[in-house]
Amino acid sequence: MAKLKITLVKSLIGRPESQRVTVRTLGLTRTNSSVIKEDTPQIRGMINKVAHLLKVEEA
């Protein structure tokens, strides 16, 4: 299965709590932090929910 590199590029300050929880669940803690995750439907759903805050690329 493919892997995705997910980077938080925008701050969570002033964002709704649901978006903050989603970003934390992805494992991102601060701006410019990155994680590598498997490309699953569950991860894609979380990415779509906060896509405006993230940069996603193939790992």
Swiss-Prot record:
One of its GO terms (molecular function) is structural constituent of ribosome. SUPFAM superfamilies: Ribosomal protein L30p/L7e. It comes from the Bacteria. InterPro entries: Ribo_uL30_ferredoxin-like_sf (IPR036919), Ribosomal_uL30_bac-type (IPR005996), Ribosomal_uL30_ferredoxin-like (IPR016082). Keywords: Ribonucleoprotein, Ribosomal protein. GO terms for biological process: translation. One of its GO terms (cellular component) is cytosolic large ribosomal subunit. Part of the 50S ribosomal subunit. Belongs to the universal ribosomal protein uL30 family. This is Large ribosomal subunit protein uL30.
